[in-house]
Amino acid sequence: MASQGTKRSYEQMETGGERQNATEIRASVGRMIGGIGRFYIQMCTELKLSDYEGRLIQNSITIERMVLSAFDERRNKYLEEHPSAGKDPKKTGGPIYRKIDGKWMRELILYDKEEIRRIWRQANNGEDATAGLTHIMIWHSNLNDATYQRTRALVRTGMDPRMCSLMQGSTLPRRSGAAGAAVKGVGTMVMELIRMIKRGINDRNFWRGENGRRTRIAYERMCNILKGKFQTAAQRAMMDQVRESRNPGNAEIEDLIFLARSALILRGSVAHKSCLPTCVYGLAVASGHDFEREGYSLVGIDPFRLLQNSQIFSLIRPNENPAHKSQLVWMACHSAAFEDLRVSSFIRGKRVVPRGQLSTRGVQIASNENMETMDSSTLELRSRYWAIRTRSGGNTNQQRASAGQISVQPTFSVQRNLPFERATVMAAFIGNTEGRTSDMRTEIIRMMESAKPEDVSFQGRGVFELSDEKATSPIVPSFDMSNEGSYFFGDNAEEYDN
């Protein structure tokens, strides 16, 4: 990206910081992570969780959801103005699991939001530490990306379910700021824009008046975020058209769907960060690790290191496979839901299988599930190598991909060919070049057709031994590209339901 000089790194977005040098960034990200860890330790004390219970990922998720809810100002305001039966707008809670006489029991807890906010601020030197909250949101988003398909949501907005590799971050709340915007896939942005345009079509006051002016500003901002993800001039020019439209309607929806499809080959830049469950940070802080002093990066070796030395657990349903549960969480931790499985397998040092072959449901346990039969097992989150997370889609080229997911969105900066099913992608573009964006469409289609299989993405980038923390000796793996590389291939993952 030519504009690299003017861009803030994700760590800077993550910590809300202005431009800083590498050491300052590592320190401010470390400060954020340390604050999250201190908060977790304090919550475990408040809830009287044993060491083992504090390492249970389900307890971690409940605590995370409580703090996100405590700071969700818009929802809190809404709840106070629209009191609903049996919901106290000032309280938040969830299931906490405890081991009693060798059995896991569920206990529903309720806390004052004010109290949670106090504990959070206290752990973060008295500040609101919004960056830490966003970090937790991204971890939840990465977990959703690895767990669920978005077929229904894609179909509802007129997109193709096979475009699932573009849907990173589709469950992130709008309030997730610049760091959240950086990790959203092209499909996610397109879907948000289409929903907005559809509301405008159905409600003639949507773009009018003082509210409409704010809506318009939000629309243009989202268009600019999406434009910034595209790497070719023609795609960006098309986004300018969509943004400048006086009265966005079906023509804009068409253009956006066209752009989303084009991103299967002309990939957008989507950031990837390893965001870990809060209990992992808590364990590290409790064992005396000083994140701010040591510094931390979300895109380097640090998260791999942390996972090498933390033992955390998960509840397991009777017919689930603990190894599969571990894979799900490993993928979520490294934001690798849409990465090529061959790359993930190499880095993890264990075969990573497609979603459809996993004998596991999501990590969270529904309130009506029977606890009698629940067991717990250790999550195996270690890796054989580490690799730098990427913020670009890599160069583009042709390769066979699959019936389910027809492209990948790389997570790790590792040299390889990027697979996608050229025939399938191109079939979507037949004869669709009329209208005011026709020259751009023609140009985009031409670029897609000329993308070559032998072009290697991330030239010379490789994986590193875990002892090579300065990334000095890259190992460039060779992949057997004849195999299937998509995670959501021919898939039966559950749908994501709010």
Swiss-Prot record:
Annotated keywords: Capsid protein, Helical capsid protein, Host nucleus, Host-virus interaction, Ribonucleoprotein, RNA-binding, Viral nucleoprotein, Viral penetration into host nucleus, Virion, Virus entry into host cell
Lineage of the organism: Viruses, Riboviria, Orthornavirae, Negarnaviricota, Polyploviricotina
The UniProt record lists the keyword RNA-binding: yes
Chief location bin: virion
Locus of motif Unconventional nuclear localization signal: 1-18
Gene label: NP
Organism for this UniProt entry: Influenza A virus (strain A/Swine/Ohio/23/1935 H1N1)
Protein name per the record: Nucleoprotein
UniProt modification remark: Late in virus-infected cells, may be cleaved from a 56-kDa protein to a 53-kDa protein by a cellular caspase. This cleavage might be a marker for the onset of apoptosis in infected cells or have a specific function in virus host interaction.
Quaternary organization: Homomultimerizes to form the nucleocapsid. May bind host exportin-1/XPO1. Binds to viral genomic RNA. Protein-RNA contacts are mediated by a combination of electrostatic interactions between positively charged residues and the phosphate backbone and planar interactions between aromatic side chains and bases.
Family in the record: Belongs to the influenza viruses nucleoprotein family.
Localization annotation: Virion; Host nucleus
GO CC annotations, alphabetized: helical viral capsid; host cell; host cell nucleus; ribonucleoprotein complex; viral nucleocapsid
GO molecular-function terms, A-Z: RNA binding; structural molecule activity
GO BP field: symbiont entry into host cell; viral penetration into host nucleus
Family matches, as InterPro entries: Flu_NP
Functional note: Encapsidates the negative strand viral RNA, protecting it from nucleases. The encapsidated genomic RNA is termed the ribonucleoprotein (RNP) and serves as template for transcription and replication. The RNP needs to be localized in the host nucleus to start an infectious cycle, but is too large to diffuse through the nuclear pore complex. NP comprises at least 2 nuclear localization signals that are responsible for the active RNP import into the nucleus through cellular importin alpha/beta pathway.
